């Protein structure tokens, strides 16, 4: 039996670290369901790993729904989180609509990339009763506009923004926050 998405926040409150891996298909999900992970992520990285795109920006909602369904069919004990792909959260109402689609496909939680600029969408998703995971640091959906993959939080200004964004997302009610390519000393402060 799957735990409730609220178990992720409870783990944080208890000082536990979360363990997760990425899955894009049924057989992988079946195998990983036996590993005792906190959740599986159906990542938009499937655009590169499965579909052969150069980055995640070309992944569609249809791609995410298809792969979320496959992963959800493969688990009985592990929560499933699904990425909201690039462009799927342009407005709070669009973010809610697309989050509902991922939930209908079998996701227990959705994951959204971005900080305070995404707070209206984050709050709308959570207000609709959909559990959410934030994603800060290097944001793959912005790799084209940022000119590549770069460590975040090295400068004082970046570090302060990451901390501020994490606090805002946490206070909004996110179940967890993914930190990607965050400067190690700053990341250590989060965990």
Q: What is the predicted role of each segment?
A:
Residues 2-191:
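Alpha/beta enzyme core
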